[in-house]
Structure formats: structure tokens, C-alpha cells
Amino acid sequence: MGSSYFFGYVINWLCLVYSGWVLTVKLTEQELKERVSKMTIWKKREQRAPHKPLLLLLALSKLQAGEKRLTYEETRLKLKELLMEFGPRRRRYCPEEPFVRLTTDGLWELSESVNKNQIQDKLLLEKRISGGFNPEVLTLLEKRPAMRQEIAEQLLYAHFPETMHQEILQAVGFELATTPRKRRDPEFRNRILKAYEYSCAICGFNVRLGSQLVAIDAAHIQWHQAGGPDQEENGIALCTLHHKLFDRGVFTITNDRTLLVSEEAHGTSGFKEWLMRYHGTEIRSPISPMYRPKLVFLEWHVREVFKGTARHIYR
């Protein structure tokens, strides 16, 4: 009887110790990075959906400023603005969707539960819903401020081209302590630059400092972050200025290699010289027809990056 009692006591004690250990297990830095990388992103063929990444970057910025919670009422307009600026052109932008659905990724929580089958902007406003990082994520981000930087870089590299990183950081108000390192495939760069004779396919810019080529990039037409391959048919050599304008959707390129400027683009100094003078003209051809951009990649750029309708071409 005594031995049975003692045995039961030991088992109960071990269970309590085990339970306590489980409850005190903390989220590790690697686990957080894995959750971010495995975050569910809405997909339909090759359409872009940067909703969750932009919301997380905005939340990281708020946390950096000492704000742990985001009210939906205050967040919706800013998130919509970010989606319009850095996302593809859409009829509706639906900031309520990521604000609620991010709870399924082990990163986010809401002030109260919301039916994911009936996500409504009006309902979130009426209930004054707020959101923020869940306790274990928040604890790690507060204890290790450097993780905020690392997660921000992870989100940027996974979902946006490098030409947009600084603008996105400025738009969300996040201060990055270190400049993100470039992670380009050197072979892709070399093949593209060779295909376009080491010159910008639009303006012909070609400058060297000694033997080093300066300010010429190998640009993906369909972004690498959106599944675009490192192939010549998905690349074009551009100077850093035209690369940035191309990635921001200021202009696009048609299947017959005609450059078209967006109606939404405008400006004063430099606008005519660096954009409008090339509007409606054919960009330079690569050294071989086999390197010409494929229609599937050009169509993706028009659909997912180009901002609005093209300007009229006056002959």
C-alpha cells in the first residue's frame, strides 16, 4: 500500500514538473523565423498578395515606437495606402483580410475572435477590434530588439525586390540599423549584362570605373520573389534609375519591346529626359533573339507591377 502510494506520488510529481516545463518553453529565434517564412500567403496563379508582409512591417514599426497594439480603425487606412503604393493594382484592397487572417500563422492575435468566413470591414470597426503580436512573439521581440531588424529584412527579401526596400521602410516608418546585404545570383547578372552588351536597354547608360561596371543592374521582369526564374528571357539590363522605375511600375514593356509610361507618372525635372523621351519607343534588343523577354513574364509585369493605364502614344 505504501509503495503504491509512493509510486503514485512520484508519477504525479513528474507530471507536474513536465507540465511546468512545457508551459515555460519559450519561442526561439529560429522558430519565429520559420513561422514568418511559412506564413500563409494568398495565391492565385502568379498574382502578388503582399498584405500580410506589409501589415507585419507596419506592426514592427509600431513596436519600435513603443506601440504594442494596433487598432483596426487606425491601421486600415495606412495598410490600404501601403497596398496601393507597393502592391499590384486591384479594384479593392481589403485591409481587413490580413488583419484577421494573420492570426492563423502563429504570429498575431486579436482583441476578440472574429469569424474568418465573414470578415467585414464594418464589423471590425463596430467592435473596435485591435491586433498585435501574440504574447510569445511579443516577448521575444521585446527581449531581443535585433530580431525586429532580422524579421523586417526577412520580409523584405522574401516579398519585394531590393529596389523597393528603402521606400517601404520609409513608408511604414521602420528604422533599419543595418543596410540589407544584396543576395543576387552572380551568374544571372553576368548572363544578362552580356546579353545587353553591358548597357542599359533603355537609355544605353554604360560607365566603368577602371574595369568595374557601375550602376548597371540585371533586373528580373517577373520578380524572383514572385517565382520569376533566373533566365535570360526573364531579365533585362537596366541602369539603377530605370531599374527602380521599372520595379515601381512607372513604366512597362510590351511584347514588341515598346516602352510605355503610366498615366499616373508625372514630374518636372528629369521626367521628360529619363521617361517621356522613351515612351512609345522600342528598347534595345539583346545580342541574340533567344534572349528576348518572354511574353509570359512581360504580361506578369503589366498585370502585377505596372501602375494603371499607359499614356497615349502620339506619332
Feature annotation, model-predicted:
Residues 22, 208, 212-315:
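A detector for short metal-coordination/catalytic motifs
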Residues 151-208, 221-233, 313-314:
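Short, charged surface segments at domain edges that flank catalytic/cofactor-binding sites
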Residues 10, 21-183, 256-262, 269-270, ...:
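Mixed-charge, low-complexity interaction segments
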Residues 5-9, 18:
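Aromatic (phenylalanine/tyrosine) cluster motif
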